[in-house]
């Protein structure tokens, strides 16, 4: 956030007469106490609350100040100092005391294209400087084209009021609806991306008025004016342009182009044959020592235009109605965008529902197949289980039979074992008998042998 001098401006400057006022600003003449030099003090009413529409926001004030701090050009007003108090930010600006260019020209009996273009060239030079710094003024109109001093042979143009000027950043799309309806470009009316080209349209309108005293798009109402601008509804009425050169008309045509990309740039405008031809004619006239032939334009209609413009300034050229209109357009654009977003969301939701339905149907078919397969598997398992249970019962019966058989075998084995033991005892007894018999026989045999020997 920029910081300004938190001092009372009247400690440094003596305030004088009011020079002009706008919706949220008052400009007063002032004199610096130390030097006696005269300046213009622009009191900008600060917005107290962000939700309020009274006053200028801090962001807007800082934007204007930052732009003024950056620019230094003979045809652009200069910022000298800045003060701030509780209610206002005060810009101390170069004093531009020569009045409006159109008022100055309207005081003349007649005007030549050459004279008009000398001033136009200064306007182009100032805008060229701004555009070289990517600064768009966005409010070029007769009231903001002033003379530093009209009481000199060659008055100097000064472009003033940078309240809605913007720095155009590459890659950052900028849209807004502001400016003075009579001079705004179609892209502003239609809420389209804005750039330096909008200033060139305004220069086209200013040139048209300068040469004819008529406004190309001005209607009975603001809505009619904006409709004419959007439709690029204008022509070169012979009543107003009978003394205007074709080159001048071509210059205007190349600026009043709806497509910003096809509109003449500031560099191209400075190289346009109409601007360069006047310079060449002036040089030839100086070399030959005679004045070049000049087309003279009546200033009667320009007088009428300036009188009408000043008298209708409060109701017709104030920003209030146009701002309300712009708010309506912004809200309508936001509503349309919201509707488009809702339609996109509805379409996406419908697509999601269809996708989910397709997934559900696919899953349902898969579950159905799986269910059928599982049913078959369950039936097969049930059959296997029944078989297993039957085999189990058979095995149990066989085991029971085997147990019964084992008990019988045990009893039979026991009986056989008993019989075996009895037989073993009997055999043992008989074996002892035989052994005793054999021993007895052997003794008898021995006894017989002994008897024979004797």
Swiss-Prot record:
Residues where Phosphoserine is found: 50, 309, 311-312, 318, 326
UniProt-recorded Gene Ontology molecular function terms: ATP binding; cAMP response element binding protein binding; identical protein binding; leucine zipper domain binding; protein homodimerization activity; protein kinase activity; protein serine kinase activity; protein serine/threonine kinase activity
Region (Leucine-zipper): 427-441
Gene3D superfamilies: Phosphorylase Kinase, domain 1, Transferase(Phosphotransferase) domain 1
Activity modulation: A sequential activation is proposed: autophosphorylation at consensus sites is leading to dimerization of the catalytic domain stabilized by phosphorylation at Ser-50 and activation segment exchange (producing an active confirmation of both kinase modules in trans) followed by phosphorylation at Thr-180 in the activation segment and at other regulatory sites. Phosphorylation at Thr-180, Thr-225 and Thr-265 is essential for activity. Oligomerization is required for full enzymatic activity. Inhibited by pyridone-6 (K00225), a potent, ATP-competitive inhibitor.
Catalysed reaction, written as an equation: L-seryl-[protein] + ATP = O-phospho-L-seryl-[protein] + ADP + H(+); L-threonyl-[protein] + ATP = O-phospho-L-threonyl-[protein] + ADP + H(+)
Annotated signal sequence range: none
Consequence of changing residue 434 to A: Predominantly nuclear localization
Residues annotated as domain Protein kinase: 13-275
Record's protein name: Death-associated protein kinase 3
Provenance organism: Homo sapiens (Human)
Gene transcribed to yield this protein: DAPK3
């Amino acid at each position: 956030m920029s910081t300004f001098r938190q001092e009372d401006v009247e400690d440094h400057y003596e305030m004088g007469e009011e020079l002009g006022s706008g919706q949220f600003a008052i400009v007063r003449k002032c004199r610096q106490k130390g030097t006696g030099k005269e300046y213009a003090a622009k009191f900008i009413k600060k917005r107290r609350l962000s939700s309020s529409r009274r006053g200028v926001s801090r962001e807007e004030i800082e934007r204007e100040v930052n732009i003024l701090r950056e620019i230094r050009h003979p045809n652009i007003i200069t910022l000298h100092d800045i003060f701030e108090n509780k209610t206002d930010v005060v810009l101390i600006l170069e004093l531009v005391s020569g009045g409006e260019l159109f008022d100055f020209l309207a005081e003349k009996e007649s005007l030549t294209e050459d004279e008009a273009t000398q001033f136009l060239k200064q306007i182009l030079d100032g805008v060229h400087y701004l555009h070289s710094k990517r600064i768009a003024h966005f409010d070029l109109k007769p009231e903001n084209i002033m003379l530093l001093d009209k009481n000199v042979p060659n008055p100097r143009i000064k472009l003033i009021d940078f309240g809605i000027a913007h720095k155009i950043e590459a890659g950052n799309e900028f849209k807004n609806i502001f400016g003075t309806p009579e001079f705004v470009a179609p892209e502003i009316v239609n809420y389209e991306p804005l750039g330096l080209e909008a200033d060139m349209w305004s220069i086209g309108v200013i040139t048209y008025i300068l040469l004819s005293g008529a406004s190309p798009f001005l209607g009975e109402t603001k809505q009619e004016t904006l409709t004419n601008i959007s439709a690029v509804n204008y022509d070169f009425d012979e009543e107003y342009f009978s003394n205007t050169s074709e080159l001048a008309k071509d210059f205007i045509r190349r600026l009043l182009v709806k497509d910003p990309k096809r509109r003449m740039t500031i560099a191209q405008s400075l190289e346009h044959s109409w601007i360069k031809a006047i310079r060449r004619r002036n040089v030839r006239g100086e070399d030959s020592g005679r004045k070049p032939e000049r087309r003279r334009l009546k200033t009667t209609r320009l007088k009428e235009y300036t009188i009408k413009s000043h008298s209708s300034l409060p109701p017709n050229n104030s920003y209030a109605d146009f701002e309300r209109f712009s708010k309506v357009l912004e809200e309508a654009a936001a509503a349309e965008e919201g509707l488009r977003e809702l339609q996109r969301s509805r379409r996406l939701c419908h697509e999601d529902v269809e996708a989910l339905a397709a997934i559900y149907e696919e899953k349902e078919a898969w579950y159905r197949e799986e269910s059928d397969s599982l049913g078959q598997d369950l039936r097969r398992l049930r059959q296997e289980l029944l078989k297993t249970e039957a085999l189990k019962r058979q095995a149990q019966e066989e085991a029971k039979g085997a147990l019964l058989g084992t008990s019988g075998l045990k009893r039979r084995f026991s009986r056989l074992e008993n019989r075996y033991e009895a037989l073993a005892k009997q055999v043992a007894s008989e074996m002892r008998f035989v052994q005793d018999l054999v021993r007895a026989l052997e003794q008898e045999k021995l006894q017989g042998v002994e008897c024979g020997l004797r």
